[in-house]
A protein has these predicted regions:
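N-terminal metal-binding scaffold of metallo-dependent hydrolase/deaminase domains
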Residues: 1-25, 348, 355, 359
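C-terminal cap of metal-dependent C-N hydrolases
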Residues: 6, 322, 332-362
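Conserved, mostly hydrophobic/aromatic
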Residues: 30, 41, 65, 109, ...
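Divalent metal-dependent hydrolysis catalytic cores, especially in the metallo-beta-lactamase
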Residues: 43, 59-88, 102-115, 142-156, ...
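Active-site gating loops and adjacent loop-to-helix segments of metal-dependent hydrolytic enzymes
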Residues: 63-74, 115-143, 185-197, 201, ...
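Active-site core of metal-dependent hydrolases
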Residues: 136, 140-261, 361
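His/Asp/Glu-enriched, well-ordered alpha-helical/loop segment
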Residues: 213-223, 229, 241-253, 258-344
Length: 362
């Protein structure tokens, strides 16, 4: 496919599109042309969830995400027993996308190795201490698709788990009560990511700094951030980008099955979630994921939080691809990589067209 006109993201900024390539012509006048988006932390959409453990659910998710410009997905599990997680992993391993479905490039294990004291919307009944043998069994069931594993580093055996598994899978700190020193220790042992920055962790405090400063002090640690207009105030989004720099921020949607549907009550990890607009909450008011997609998060970050477009694009494409080790094939528009691209309206930043594996989606 040939894309003419428009402004193309080259990894650092935007350049005018060159009239190169073969095949059908796509006129990108009035658009920004960016790489296909990569969401490494979300749960589902259109009534489907990764944890449904079926090919049908994965197909629904992959089709909707592709239509929204998310061409590579790494959906997240919830906290469940091993038997349930194994079924989810087997379904993921068996999934093969059709022409209009996003590529399943990984699975994110958000539970069960988390803290019961920072449970969020996870089910406390199934929380357990980190277990390397269990993770290896699940990785085998997934055919190697597990790319991210969340862990609360203060829990029993967590640092030993990181020592053993950090060379096999990316370890992210999540749903944690860890203080600054514990977090630093986890990074020294090999953890390399902080899950949904600010959420489900001790807040920044001048005498009890907590996980956030421990993360930004290390150049090899990335931070996820939910830019949905609900989870985080715009000022805190700006602060995160300034602290970490745009090479270390990973935008995520953390979307759940209500995304793309009307307001109502939906299931997330076996618990009822009430959705009103972009706000998804448990009965006690706890925020329970989001009801938006990564393209909308990118737009909100730019238009409402004043993040430079170039920085937001990095955080939704190259950075997540690098975080889960698929950057050799995805996250940039360049020779040798999968031909995924998204055309954003230059004025509204709405998704106008999606190119998926070299084909224009209808």
């Amino acid at each position: 496919m040939r894309i003419i006109n428009g402004s193309v993201f080259d990894g650092e900024g935007f350049v005018e599109a060159a009239d190169v390539g073969d095949g059908d012509v796509l006129d990108a006048a009035g658009c920004y042309v960016i790489p296909g988006l990569v969401d490494v932390h979300f749960h589902g959409c259109l009534g489907a969830d990764l944890c449904d453990g079926t090919g049908e659910a994965l197909s629904t998710i992959a089709r909707h995400e592709a239509s929204r410009g998310v061409t590579a997905i790494c959906p997240a599990t919830m906290t469940y027993p091993e038997e349930k997680l194994a079924g989810i992993m087997r379904a993921a391993a068996a999934f093969a996308p059709t022409d209009n479905e996003a590529a399943l490039v990984g699975v994110n294990m958000e539970g069960p190795f988390i803290s019961p004291d920072k449970i969020g919307a996870q089910n406390p009944a199934y929380v357990q201490v980190p277990d390397a043998a269990m993770l290896r069994r699940l990785q085998e069931a997934a055919g190697g698709l597990v790319k991210l594993v969340d862990i609360a580093p203060e829990e029993e055996g967590a640092l030993a788990f990181i020592d053993e598994m950090a060379d096999e899978v990316r370890i992210s700190l999540a749903h944690t009560t860890a203080d600054y020193d514990c977090t630093r220790a986890a990074f020294e042992h090999g953890a390399r990511q902080l899950t949904h920055l600010y959420n489900a962790m001790p807040p920044l405090h001048h005498r009890k700094p907590g996980p956030i400063p421990a993360a930004f002090e290390r150049d090899d640690v990335t931070a996820e951030l939910i830019a949905d207009g609900v989870h985080i105030h715009p000022a805190m989004v700006r602060m995160a980008f300034r602290l970490f720099g745009d090479d270390r921020m990973v935008l995520i949607s953390d979307s759940m099955r209500a995304t793309g549907l009307e307001d109502g009550v939906y299931d997330l990890g076996g618990q009822d979630v009430t959705v009103r607009g972009n706000l998804a909450t448990l009965a006690d008011g706890t925020i329970a994921g989001s009801a938006t997609d990564l393209a909308a998060c990118l737009r909100w970050a730019v238009r409402e939080a004043d993040i430079p477009l170039e920085s937001a694009v990095k955080a939704a494409t190259a950075n997540p691809a690098r975080a889960i080790g698929v950057d050799a094939e995805r996250g940039a528009i360049e020779p040798g990589k999968v031909a995924d691209a998204v055309l954003l309206d230059a004025e509204t930043l709405d998704v106008r067209h999606v190119v998926l594996r070299g084909r224009l989606l209808a």
